Design a protein with these regions (language model features):
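Extended non-membrane alpha-helical scaffolds
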Residues: 29-36, 51-209
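Repeat-based scaffolding regions
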Residues: 1-28, 34-46, 57-60, 73-77, ...
Length: 209
């Protein structure tokens, strides 16, 4: 399908969206390696075309770099991706939860925890606001992680529950292991060992399928 799309004449927006699809495909199938760099390049292409989509893609790039860790390609470490993403244009309208997460995460990796803490708290609080079912899986797991980092146990519980419910509703099987992991952690922290064990068993079943 990508090859067919490339065969025809493409506008700048269509070309940028094609690169984004390619980058997200690599991210979904490899969870590391080239994904952060491809997403970063796609975000840069989108900057002059669609700022909201560019910022969402920068957030995807930061998330991919976090996930990839040492497996990220040269030039796409979490610090390097965050530094580029921090220079992204501001959102064109009122900042949405993914915008606030992007600002908080880039501050965390470029300026440190103390500078990022107010931004991360704001992002976690805003994450209670629903956006779109298609968009939320891209950032909701990060909101769960950040809720634990800022010691917001109530929202950690709420967001992890919403994340796994959303993934189940969408039938997004590729996202289910990550959603289960995000849900297991607050359950363990709260001492709900039986519920956590049940989800761990489900994780094994999904991964073996």
């Amino acid at each position: 399908l990508l090859a067919m799309a490339e065969a025809g004449p493409l506008s700048d927006l269509e070309q940028a969206r094609l690169e984004l699809v390619r980058a997200r495909l690599v991210s979904a199938t490899s969870r590391g390696g080239d994904a952060p760099l491809l997403l970063l390049r796609a975000a840069q292409q989108l900057e002059g075309i669609d700022i909201s989509l560019a910022r969402a893609t920068y957030l995807d790039a930061v998330a991919a770099a976090i996930y990839a860790g040492r497996l990220a390609s040269p030039g796409a470490s979490t610090m390097e991706v965050a530094r580029v993403a921090a220079a992204a244009p501001p959102p064109p309208n009122r900042p949405r939860p993914p915008d606030l997460l992007l600002d908080g995460l880039t501050a965390l990796f470029t300026r440190g925890y103390t500078a990022a803490l107010p931004l991360l708290r704001q992002a976690v609080a805003a994450a209670e606001e629903s956006t779109s079912a298609d968009e939320e899986p891209h950032w909701l797991w990060l909101a769960c992680v950040m809720a634990s980092h800022v010691w917001d146990d109530e929202r950690w519980e709420l967001l992890s529950r919403r994340y796994i419910q959303l993934v189940r509703q969408l039938g997004a099987l590729s996202e289910l292991p990550l959603a289960l992991d995000r849900r297991i952690r607050p359950l363990l922290f709260a001492g709900e060992l039986t519920a956590a064990a049940a989800l761990l068993d489900e994780t094994r079943t999904v991964e073996d399928a």
